[in-house]
Structures are given as C-alpha cells and as structure tokens.
UniProtKB/Swiss-Prot annotation:
GO biological process: 1-aminocyclopropane-1-carboxylate metabolic process; amine catabolic process
This protein's name: 1-aminocyclopropane-1-carboxylate deaminase
Positions of post-translational N6-(pyridoxal phosphate)lysine modification: K51
Higher taxonomy: Bacteria, Pseudomonadati, Pseudomonadota, Gammaproteobacteria, Enterobacterales
Gene3D superfamilies: 3.40.50.1100
GO terms, molecular function: 1-aminocyclopropane-1-carboxylate deaminase activity; D-cysteine desulfhydrase activity; pyridoxal phosphate binding
Amino acid sequence: MNLNRFERYPLTFGPSPITPLKRLSQHLGGKVELYAKREDCNSGLAFGGNKTRKLEYLIPEAIEQGCDTLVSIGGIQSNQTRQVAAVAAHLGMKCVLVQENWVNYSDAVYDRVGNIEMSRIMGADVRLDAAGFDIGIRPSWEKAMSDVVEQGGKPFPIPAGCSEHPYGGLGFVGFAKKLRQQEKELGFKFNYIVVCSVTGSTQAGMVVGFAADGRSKNVIGVDASAKPEQTKAQILRIARHTAELVELGREITEEDVVLDTRFAYPEYGLPNEGTLEAIRLCGSLEGVLTDPVYEGKSMHGMIEMVRRGEFPEGSKVLYAHLGGAPALNAYSFLFRDG
C-alpha cells in the first residue's frame, strides 16, 4: 500500500489521542473494553473533526491550482462546512458555503448557533438553501461555484463530506496507518472499530486502510443517513477507488463493507430516544460529548451492541469519535432538562 505518494498539507495535530472509556465499559458490564479515538479534538482549527483530516489531502490540489475560494456544501448544522471555513481562514482563502435544509427540525435558533455560527464568525459567505437531504452532487453547490467564477474568482470544489472528491478516502487510510503505530505503543490491537457513516468516505478510507492488515470487516459502520442502500453503495464505490489509488493490491468487495442500519431512525438529523440516552450516558459517565446527528447515533449503536452481547467477551472496541459536538447548541430544546 502506497499512501506516501500523495501530498498532505498538515491541518491536524498528528495522530489523535486514544482514551479508555472505563466508566462506560463498567456501566455496560465490564466484559468489553471500550476506547475512543478522539478525532473530535484532532486540530486547533475550529474544533477539528474527521473532515479536517480528509482536507489534508485535498488542500494541496487547491493550492497547486491557484484557487482562491473553497466552495462546500452541507446541512444547516454541517460539521463539514465549519471545518472548510476554518481551513479557508487558516490559508487566507475565501469561502462560500451552501447550507441546505437537510434536517426536519424547527428549533428557533437552529440556523444561528453551533456550526453555522462559527462559519459566519470565520468569514464564510453562508448561503441558506431550502433543498432537503440527499447524497451526491447538488445543483445548489454547482451554482455556488459558477457564482464564484462569474465574480472573477477561482473556486475549489469540496463536496459534502469530501466524499465525491477522488481523494476523499485518503485521510482515513492514513488514520488506519497511524492507528497501527499507536497499537504498537499500546501493546495490543483493537478487535473492532465503530464509526458513523453517511456520505461514506470516512468508513471507505478505514476499510481500505484496515484491509492492509486483514481487519476491513472489523470496521463496523453505523448508518446515520436513514438511506442505507445509498450510503453502503457510496462506501463500496469510494473504497474501491481509494484502494486503486493507494495500490492496496486486492479488490474491495461487498463483504468488506459492514454497515449497521438499526440506529439511523427516525430520519437523518433527528435522534430517537436511544440516541438521546447514549448522548447523556456518555456525557455523564465520561465527559465525552456526542451530537444527535452523527456521533450520538454511532455511540447508541456501540452501546446496544455491547448490551446485546454482539462483541465477544474480552473484545477491545475502538469508537471513532469524528466530532460534531458544536451542533449540540442547535438542539438545546432537546436537552433543556439535561
């Protein structure tokens, strides 16, 4: 596998820390050891997150092409767009963000706090759009790029989740490579890695990265899109492309992609009671914050897998915390009583 042939622009602190979730493990019976990989604090740029790690492999192309404006898209409380805004500010570039109405949630402050507030503070041109949630290339995003060109700028397109970019999976191939180094220091290997999946490139990169040591099927994606067929197809397509890029040496198959579809509902961006319980439980036992859109759902999934005995006794399970806590303010009504 050859990741080193791709240029990387450093935006993170390096390998994110691994912390044991001792109290949560004990609360769930103590038969499975839970750990967290803290991608939620991987950078000093506006709280970081998994997209910041992905952007390390996209930004060299933007610089090489002489682009002056990063153009991205997400929902109103998109973590992606906040991280793109932070990187643009860091590099001295302009930033245009299309924020679509992906979530059927009507909190009075939803479009004024959290991620979107931070993007505005960092100087991004934030454009609200009424379009609902879907996966793939969006007309509103293409129009935003055309607008930049018409105004004499040179846009660099960053699709939702970085996932439609050819290099969108590389950051989490690197994640797997760095984790192997950390495992050597810890003196053990993780039996399973749990990760949230929506647009697909985070899990796709992990699948490729861990295929190098035979653990691709040990990456358990937890769907948060409520469109699991689309998400799984995305993961597989991106993983196959990424495997070719890094010269993995074998084909990625459908069997390599494990996606648990039980925890995404009622729909994208809206938590169920199990997700809210998981957010409160992890927060109160570990001081680790997760959000109702992504990480709360993958945390819910991991907790339920432990409760149901789906991990063999003695397993060491790594929860990939991808970020997302800045969105909590937008859901303040749900937590008005804690």
